[in-house]
UniProtKB/Swiss-Prot annotation:
The RuvA-RuvB-RuvC complex processes Holliday junction (HJ) DNA during genetic recombination and DNA repair, while the RuvA-RuvB complex plays an important role in the rescue of blocked DNA replication forks via replication fork reversal (RFR). RuvA specifically binds to HJ cruciform DNA, conferring on it an open structure. The RuvB hexamer acts as an ATP-dependent pump, pulling dsDNA into and through the RuvAB complex. RuvB forms 2 homohexamers on either side of HJ DNA bound by 1 or 2 RuvA tetramers; 4 subunits per hexamer contact DNA at a time. It catalyses: ATP + H2O = ADP + phosphate + H(+). NCBIfam families: PRK00080.1, ruvB. It comes from the Bacteria. It is an enzyme of class 3 (hydrolase). It is found in: Cytoplasm. DNA binds at R300, R319, R324. It comes from Burkholderia multivorans (strain ATCC 17616 / 249). This is Holliday junction branch migration complex subunit RuvB.
Length: 355
């Protein structure tokens, strides 16, 4: 069986960071203020108002929950919020905060109006989450000192602060935690024009020469995700410097991305393998997830969490009660004739009428 977690992490079009080295590149390319932030106009407009109002009142910004698919800029927005408010940012993640004391240590070291950013906040343990509730509401925490009969609860006052939580799984947040966020913002996938502007800005920061058509070609294959766009830009830049004169044109971008097995709609080998299995091995579906996993040699979780979301979001795949089904868009993409709509796929449980 293929090591799916490792394989998913190494995909050129994966929306999660591939390595700590890539995170360094991301930090260098991040916009530093809202005026430089491309896309998410509704969220950006709301934050501009809320931040300005909080600054005028000299109060901390209300607690902010950012949710949406990975790679859309949640961490970037957290850093921008802190910078626009003129305060410090402390960053951690849900899995790191294993004990109540871990969170208490962070909270007690915050200065007035600081921002505490918790990534993957849906993965907080229940014990840590309980400590967080009074901190969010009253800027106080209760900690236990001592053990056994001598143990006692001590209430500690905290400086006013802003919690910015980020998650790709908003549905996994408990209701009490979700209700404590005054500002809730969903980040959406970017369109090609927005991504093209991001690519051109990043190219300028990387001192890469790119024309608008080259930027658009990269943008169209970036699956609506800035992180993927910036990763593809770096690889296309490498190709342009070695195989051409360093100028990224549409033709150079197309050749570089073809070399990377990224097709015109942003599919890679794994996407195509899944869709072609449904088309050719299961006559377009429906096919159960376990049968599909066995057919392509991938884990069920990898299909559900890594491969399917983008294919469903773009209309290439449907989940039905009977299994996964390829759409007409998928048939067109692979240059195949779609089945007659009046000829439903027969299930193994269907029986012919008695003669």
């Amino acid at each position: 069986m293929i090591e799916t977690d490792k394989l998913a992490a190494e995909r050129i079009i994966a929306a999660t960071p591939a390595s700590s080295h890539e995170e360094v590149f991301e930090r260098a390319l991040r916009p530093r203020q809202l005026d430089d932030y491309v896309g998410q106009e509704k969220v950006r407009g709301q934050l501009e108002i809320f931040i300005e109002a909080a600054k005028r009142r000299r109060e901390p910004l209300d607690h902010v929950l950012l949710f949406g698919p990975p790679g859309l800029g949640k961490t970037t927005l957290a850093h921008i919020i802190a910078r626009e408010m003129g305060v410090n940012l402390r960053q951690t993640s849900g899995p790191v905060l294993e004990r109540a004391g871990d969170l208490a240590a962070l909270l007690t070291n915050l200065e007035a109006n600081d921002v505490l950013f918790i990534d993957e906040i849906h993965r907080l343990s229940p014990v840590v989450e309980e400590i967080l509730y009074p901190a969010l509401e009253d800027y106080q925490i209760d900690i236990m000192i001592g053990e056994g009969p001598a143990a006692r609860s001590v209430k500690l006052d905290l400086q006013p602060f802003t919690l910015v939580g980020a998650t790709t799984r908003a549905g996994m947040l408990t209701n009490p935690l979700r209700d404590r966020f005054g500002i809730v913002a969903r980040l959406e996938f970017y369109d090609a024009d927005q991504l093209s502007r991001i690519v051109q800005r990043s190219a300028s920061l990387l001192n890469a020469q790119i024309d608008p058509n080259g930027a658009l070609e990269i943008a169209k294959r970036s699956r609506g995700t800035p992180r993927i766009a910036n990763r593809l830009l770096r690889r296309v830049r490498d190709y342009a410097e070695v195989k051409a004169d360093g100028q990224i044109t549409a033709a150079i971008a197309d050749a570089a991305l073809a070399m990377l097995d990224v097709d015109p709609v942003g599919f890679d080998l794994m996407d195509r393998k899944l869709l072609e299995a449904i088309l050719h091995k299961f006559d377009g579906g429906p096919v159960g997830i376990d049968n599909l996993a066995a057919a392509i040699g991938e884990e069920r979780d990898t299909i559900e969490d890594v491969l399917e979301p983008y294919l469903i979001q773009q209309g290439f795949l449907q989940r039905t009660p009977r299994g996964r089904v390829a759409t007409l868009l998928t048939y067109r993409h692979f240059g195949l004739a779609a089945p007659d709509a009046g000829s439903p796929v027969q299930s193994i449980w269907d029986t012919p009428d008695a003669q």
